[in-house]
Every structure is written in C-alpha cells, then in structure tokens.
C-alpha cells in the first residue's frame, strides 16, 4: 500500500507540473443538426425539446427549432404529430417551448420519435417505456440520538427530537432483462401551522453499496465517491429481491405548542420513490458522473486522457430521449414520534 501511495503521489505531481492547455479551433464546417431531449413518464403525456447544435466558439441566443415536423410512432404504428407550444412565464423570463404529445405512453410501449426540419435535417430516437419497479415492502427504523424538553408550566411544553432514520425498500427484480433505477425522496411534511416541524436529515450515500457500483477501485483510491448519486442497476440482484437501505442522519422533530397525545393531528412523512429508467437515461447519468466526478474525466479536462464520448440515443448523436416508470411509497413516522413524546412526558412526571 505504501508503494501504491508513492506511485499515486508521483503521478499526481507529474500531472500538476506538466499539464497545459491551448485553444484550438478546427477549420471544419460542421453543419448544425437536430437535438432531441425528453423525459417520458409512464402514464403521462410528455414534452419534447427540439433544438439544434452549434459551435462552442459561436454560441446562439436561442437554439430552439420551432418549425419542425415531429411524428410519434408507438409499437411501429403512427399515433400523432406533436404540437409545438411556446409559453411565456409571467415573471418575464425567457419563453419555454416544447413539442407536446396528447398520447400518454404506457409501460411496454416502444416509442419512435421522428423530427424533421428543412434547415437542420432529420433526427430519430427510440425508447421503450419500462415497467414500474416492484416494491414488496417499505419499513422505517428510526433511532433517537438526543432529546430536549422544556415545560412551560401551563400544561404545554416544547420538545426537540434528533434521530437517525433508516428506510429499507424491498425491491424485487422480476424482469429477466437488465434494469436500471433511480432512488429519490422528499420530506413529505413541514407543518408549522399544526404546531410541529419535521426536518429530514442528509442521506448517507456510503451506507448503500449499490450507489457506488459504478466506481472502480482505482477511482475510489483517487477519491471518487457516490455523494449525490442514487442511480444503480440490478447487476447485483438480477432475478432476486434487494433491500435498498436509505440512511438519513441528523433528522429532527420539533413540537412547540401544547399537545394532547390522544390527538391524531400530525403525521410527519417521508416520500420515497424508485424509478425504473431506460438504458439511454442510465448511460447518460453514468456519463455525466464520470465527467463531473470521475478521475478519467478530470484527466481528460487537462489533456491527459481521451475525452469521454457523450451518450445519446438520437440518430444525430445529440440529445437523450429517456423513459421511466415510478413506484412511490409514503413512510409515516407518527407512531414513532408519539411513542417517543409519551416516553419523554412520562419521564418528566
């Protein structure tokens, strides 16, 4: 290990001392092409962004292509032509434009989008809408780390709880094909008007191994980690079930009004979801991670490695048309909070 450290230090020193950059403008006349981007959610109509590419050294004010003809095919059958819509926000910000579908794709649909422009040519993208993940069970394992109690003397009091929350999501991989997922969450309640405030702590990405499955041993040694990245595949549990564990540190619950344990008026909740995503989206997310956080991406930025080629499922090589299907669950912490509050109240008597 000591020898490895010396090699790493020597390599980093070499990169630092010898790296250089030089502006380079290739004398090529690369024509602009169509760029397609969309996130298609099962069961919902979708919006498609149609823009054109441009030279990095010659930026354009608005790359939107508003006169394209966009056709949608589902399972090899023509369904509709998407309608161009330009909305102008009331706050005066730049207009938002997209091509909108009336059709709501279902899981299993094979979608083909064909866009044509007289000026920028044609672009085609294909994607299959995945099925929602099978989540068999979701359970919470909270653990109190500290408490604070203040008796106001008039029958009311204030309580502040700090706790760690582990949420275990049992995902069943029932599909024989490869599957790709994104885990997400939201604080489902912050009800100050009812006399309490619940704050969900930060997710400990290192507590769940699948969040770092894309990181090589070498990248780990060089300091890469999975912070901020909750994308994973079923490579570790293909055809099986997997207990995904989300650990949140430094959660808090604060109650500052009088309360009656018999009242059932507060339900601090956490909304968790698992998306089954298309491979086109998974590939792009992995590419984006390597560019921003990977060691090879960092070397490429300074000319010591080949540039990482962007991922695209559009025929022109520009843009990503992705699809997803979501399974969401709500985790109610009411019973845990009530039991803890009652224990605190009894201990004060």
Which residues are covered by each model-predicted region?
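N-terminal hydrophobic targeting signals that begin at the initiator methionine
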Residues: 1-2, 21
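Extreme N-terminus of proteins, especially the signal/transit-peptide cleavage junction
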Residues: 2-3, 29
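Sec-dependent signal peptide recognition
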Residues: 4-10
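Short, surface-exposed polybasic-aromatic patches that bind anionic ligands, especially phosphate groups
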Residues: 14
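C-terminal motif of bacterial Sec signal peptides marking the signal peptidase cleavage site
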Residues: 17-19
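A sequence/structural signal for flexible, mid-protein segments enriched
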Residues: 21-349
């Amino acid at each position: 290990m000591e020898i490895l450290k010396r090699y790493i230090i020597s390599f980093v020193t070499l990169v630092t001392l010898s790296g250089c950059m030089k502006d380079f403008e290739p004398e090529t006349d690369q024509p602009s092409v169509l760029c397609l981007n969309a996130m298609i959610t099962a069961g919902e109509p979708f919006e498609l962004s149609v823009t054109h590419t441009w030279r990095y050294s010659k930026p354009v004010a608005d790359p939107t292509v508003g006169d394209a003809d966009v056709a949608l095919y589902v399972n090899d059958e023509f369904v509709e032509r998407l309608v161009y819509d330009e909305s102008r926000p009331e706050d005066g910000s730049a207009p938002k434009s997209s091509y909108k579908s009336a059709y709501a794709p279902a899981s299993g649909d094979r979608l083909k989008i064909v866009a044509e422009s007289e000026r920028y040519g044609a672009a085609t993208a294909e994607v299959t809408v995945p099925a929602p993940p099978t989540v068999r069970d979701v359970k919470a394992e909270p653990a109190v780390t500290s408490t604070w109690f203040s008796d106001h003397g008039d029958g009311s009091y204030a309580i502040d709880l700090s706790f760690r929350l582990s949420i275990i999501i049992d995902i069943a991989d029932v599909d024989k094909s490869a599957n790709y997922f994104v885990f997400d969450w939201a604080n489902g309640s912050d009800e100050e008007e009812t006399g309490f405030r619940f704050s969900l702590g930060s997710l400990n990405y290192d507590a769940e191994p699948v969040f770092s499955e894309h990181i090589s041993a070498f990248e780990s040694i060089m300091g890469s980690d999975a912070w901020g990245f909750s994308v994973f595949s079923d490579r570790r549990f293909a055809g099986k079930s997997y207990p995904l564990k989300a650990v949140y540190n430094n959660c808090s619950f604060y109650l500052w009004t009088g309360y009656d344990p018999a009242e059932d008026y507060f339900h601090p909740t956490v909304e968790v979801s698992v998306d089954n995503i298309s491979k086109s989206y998974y590939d792009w997310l992995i590419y984006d991670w390597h560019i921003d956080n990977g060691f090879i991406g960092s070397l490429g930025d300074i000319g010591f490695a080949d540039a990482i080629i962007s991922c695209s499922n559009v025929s022109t090589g520009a843009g990503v048309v992705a699809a997803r299907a979501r399974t969401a669950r709500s985790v109610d912490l009411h019973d845990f909070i009530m039991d803890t509050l009652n224990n605190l109240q009894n201990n004060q008597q």
